[in-house]
Amino acid sequence: MATSDHLARMRVEYGSAEKDGSVDLDADWLDIGWVALLNQWMTEAHDAGVAEPNAMVVATIDGEGRPVTRTVLCKSVDESGISFYTNYDSDKGAQLAARPYASATFPWYLLGRQVHVRGRVTKVSAEETADYWSKRPRGSQLGAWASQQSRPIASRAALMQQLADVTARFADVDEVPVPPHWGGYLIAAEVVEFWQGRENRVHNRIRVRDGAVERLQP
């Protein structure tokens, strides 16, 4: 396959712009712990104007052993891992039920940074799900009830009718309950890698695994 010229012209030289940072990522940055550094980088991405800096690309494996990716929002970060919420009956839910492992990548292109987290996936507790659910806007709660995620539908009009039906169903309810098919997943932080783009593709990669911090070749 030949390389397209217009794609080649999109090449970016890392490490030369102020936004990339003048200090090289090193293992001692992890002295504060990977959780603190991930939160710090997320905050810096937000301050730099990155939209939804908590967005992460989550990869799962389908029934044929093929990878599937999608972007979701990270909703918590602690020593146990990172969490997100979704429809358990969705394709990703079925994939995680069959193969409970996933990887997640936070791509902050504007800053020339990425963080990768991978490990075993478990459902968060019903209490954690209920707590997060209570903080969601009512419209988002109704949308979770209305959508049979990943299932085909005839038209957008049909989808909006499902939303209208759900809205009417809960019209007299002050607090919309958590759907039985909806909740959170926790990706255990078995491996966490911090990546910083540098000049000439000699990037910085620092990995945390089993408590050990080590530099990887780019």
UniProtKB/Swiss-Prot annotation:
Give the co-factor note: Binds 1 FMN per subunit.
A matching Pfam family: PNP_phzG_C
PROSITE patterns (UniProt xref) = PYRIDOX_OXIDASE
Q: Which GO terms describe its molecular function?
A: FMN binding; pyridoxamine phosphate oxidase activity
Catalysed reaction(s) here are:
pyridoxamine 5'-phosphate + O2 + H2O = pyridoxal 5'-phosphate + H2O2 + NH4(+); pyridoxine 5'-phosphate + O2 = pyridoxal 5'-phosphate + H2O2
What keyword terms does UniProt attach to this protein?
Flavoprotein, FMN, Oxidoreductase, Pyridoxine biosynthesis
Q: Does the keyword Flavoprotein apply?
A: yes
Family as reported in the entry's similarity comment: Belongs to the pyridoxamine 5'-phosphate oxidase family.
What role does this protein play? Answer: Catalyzes the oxidation of either pyridoxine 5'-phosphate (PNP) or pyridoxamine 5'-phosphate (PMP) into pyridoxal 5'-phosphate (PLP).
Q: This chain belongs to which protein, by name?
A: Pyridoxine/pyridoxamine 5'-phosphate oxidase
Organism, per UniProt?
Mycolicibacterium gilvum (strain PYR-GCK)
